[in-house]
Amino acid sequence: MAKIIEEMINKKGLLIDDYELYGNEIAKIKSIKKLNKKDSKLIVITSMNPNPAGEGKTTTAIGLVDALNKHGYKAIGALREPSMGPVFGMKGTGSGGGLSFLKPFDKINLHFSGDFHAITAANNLIVAVIENEIHNRSSMQIDSQKILIKRCLDVNDRSLRNIEYDINHQQTKSGFNITAASDLMALFCLAHDHKDFEDKLAQTIVAYNIVNQPIRICDLELTKAIMAILEDALYANLVRTNEDNPVFVHGGPFANIAHGCNSIIATKNALALGDYVVTECGFGSDLGLEKFMNIKMASLNLKPDLIGLVISLKSIAYHAQTNEKDYVKQGFANVLCHINHIKKYNVSFIVYINVNTNTDSEEDLLTLEKLLDEHQIEHARSYAYSYGSKKSEEITKKTITLTNQINDHELKLIYDIKDHLSYKLKKICENVYGADGYELSYEAKEQLNRYEHLDFYLCIAKTPYSISDDAKLLNNPKNFKIHIERFEINYAAKLIIAITTTIYRMPGLNKEPAAKNFVMK
């Protein structure tokens, strides 16, 4: 008897050669008949700066997959795996909501197919072997103060940010990152296939020896062990929506402290199987979309066909910071920040209004739509949360029209990977955040001199709640600079991570975490 996921594969006519079942509702896709399909359309979902509960990008993306399929278009989703950090922290589950969610909901939000655990184990094995070399005073002569990779864990645990311990009587300072912000997670999501991952992994610098020579994974003779751990994890996971439409869920870096996009492997699989692929990137366009375009799309040498900007009255009110009647006009300034950013890429775009039928008044929705019309911005309402694919005629029609319109403009990125680091910083701060440049701490100034000429992508870690680096500066702040505290290097994925004020790659739990009296919903 066919499993549920096999029934969907057959019903949708997905040209899959080989897959491995994980229970009744999950399949690891191992090979596809036509991997080089050229005519698929890529739609990426982003948002304004969200309120703390989130903006509904994943729900909107899932709802759009269902809407397109309902109206006769072969659409597939390509989304990130939820991390148990936010699932048990502030945000809660991360696989959609209402009538637009993924199945199996409980498994996806917890252990899923074990990808996160595999990445955690592989990452921590690297650190353990490095420290074992130091403990045994091996000929590699690794400097205990120059270990570049930290341990990781898929739990929010602020006590592990900074730790001190002995390695054979050598005092060492280190810490943990959350798995979603680990170096291996970034490489996992930016690798094009198993071979590409293995090649980049082998050359990854993870430490330096006492005469400042780099120590790579291949020097540690660890490449084969890491590949053995991650062999199955690197295959993309296929699941389904509540309305039985296909979605790949694979990889899960955060966008505020990592690059915030699902795996390239899953995206390539989706493009090979569907005519329309709906993907998303974390938080607002200032974080997720900027990295999606300047890191993921640059790496793939690919231009998306449509950008969908999700906005909501709840987030507009959050940025307006008022209950006055004209809050929509005040909070709309944040929407315009993101539209100005999106326009820089030469990609068609649309605004999706994420409607909450329980709280949003028709009067306020009409006010919002009037503002969008005044700025000549195409828009459509999304009722995905409340109705699933029902009431989806408008969003489907406008999405298909814009996705298929001729756009011969070349993709314009914010920076080139060969630009100097100082120039990359300047371009993002001014063109994405609207800042008056940036300021460096003493530590960051010293690091900038060392990293200035690295041909790496720039990944800025900052708050998601403001276009600036200060979570309290809501809406459309002016006359500010971005403050860079330090730089961290991810040699695996070729990322320079610029850490802004009070940002940690290991989050802490909020005062009343979702883990208390947890309900899977």
UniProtKB/Swiss-Prot annotation:
GO MF terms, alphabetically ordered: ATP binding; formate-tetrahydrofolate ligase activity
GO biological process: tetrahydrofolate interconversion
EC number per UniProt: 6.3.4.3
Coiled-coil stretches noted in the UniProt entry, renumbered to this chain: none
Pfam families per UniProt: FTHFS (PF01268)
Disulfide-bonded cysteines: none
Catalyzed reactions per annotation: (6S)-5,6,7,8-tetrahydrofolate + formate + ATP = (6R)-10-formyltetrahydrofolate + ADP + phosphate
Keyword field: ATP-binding, Ligase, Nucleotide-binding, One-carbon metabolism
Pathway assignment: One-carbon metabolism; tetrahydrofolate interconversion
Domain of life according to the entry: Bacteria
Enzyme category, top tier: ligase
Record has ATP-binding as a keyword: yes
Membership in a protein family: Belongs to the formate--tetrahydrofolate ligase family.
HAMAP family per the UniProt record, alphabetical: FTHFS
Protein name: Formate--tetrahydrofolate ligase
Lineage: Bacteria, Bacillati, Mycoplasmatota, Mycoplasmoidales, Mycoplasmoidaceae
Name of the gene: fhs
